[in-house]
């Protein structure tokens, strides 16, 4: 009887622990995958230096955006829908990373999302035969490395999207940390050295180089909807409305000496 009672008490605990996630992949995977892609894109970019002050901004924006995606995926109450959304988002992002790298290495510039969308039809119909041998195959090592997170997302999908969904406090924690990373990165970029590249003088080429691909895509969409910020006017420190009461000093004219 004692052994049966022990089995009854131990069986529910085993069932409960088996349904728990075996690791923090349900919220760590997307920040790690996004940071991996950003660092990979930066490492293969021969036109920019890897270790610069902007590396901090790239890391902050990547972690913030990755935690945001983890939050969105964990908001799905159905595991199947969350799995499909996570794989689809990772696949689309991977394709964008590969396309931007090919544009950077072949055309020497990162292209805007709108330009890539408009150019996609021309590439396939116009010179699609030359894309594979001239653009894709020489950059195959980068493309294979870029698809590593997608392969892991498919293989580890049961550990990334677990049966037990996150609770409210866990989701709130993700939101706070996401806003913390994003807020620090935005503050450093907006009021730092690269203020002009982050605001009124933003371009995709400089944006990806200084802030990362995910931050550049976010800024491009934001400025397309709300417009670019206006540049700051220089502060002259003088007020033209206040009259100048300084007495005028005149030099007396003495004929024969001032000529």
Model-flagged regions — what are they?
Residues 2-7, 12-225:
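Transmembrane and membrane-interface helices of multi-pass
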């Amino acid at each position: 009887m004692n052994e049966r009672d022990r089995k009854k008490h131990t069986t529910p605990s085993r069932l409960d622990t088996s349904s728990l996630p075996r690791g923090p992949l349900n919220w760590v995977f997307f920040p790690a995958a996004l940071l991996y892609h950003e660092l990979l894109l930066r490492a293969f970019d021969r036109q920019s230096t890897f270790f610069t002050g902007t590396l901090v901004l790239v890391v902050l924006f990547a972690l913030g955006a990755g935690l945001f995606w983890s939050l969105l995926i964990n908001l799905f109450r159905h595991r199947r829908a969350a799995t499909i959304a996570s794989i689809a988002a990772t696949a689309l992002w991977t394709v964008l990373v590969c396309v931007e790298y090919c544009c950077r290495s072949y055309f020497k510039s990162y292209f805007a999302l709108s330009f890539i969308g408009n150019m996609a039809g021309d590439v396939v119909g116009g010179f699609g035969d030359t894309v594979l041998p001239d653009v894709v195959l020489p950059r195959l090592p980068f493309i294979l490395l870029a698809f590593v997170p997608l392969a892991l997302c498919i293989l580890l999908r049961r550990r990334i999207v677990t049966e037990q969904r996150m609770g409210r406090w866990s989701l709130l924690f993700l939101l706070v940390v996401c806003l913390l990373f994003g807020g620090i990165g935005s503050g450093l970029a907006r009021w730092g050295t690269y203020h002009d590249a982050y605001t009124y003088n933003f371009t995709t080429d400089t944006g990806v180089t200084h802030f990362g691909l995910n931050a550049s895509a976010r800024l491009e969409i934001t400025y397309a909807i709300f417009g670019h910020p206006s540049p700051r006017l220089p502060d002259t420190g003088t007020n033209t409305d206040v009259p100048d009461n300084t007495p005028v000093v005149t030099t007396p004219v003495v004929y024969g000496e001032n000529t």
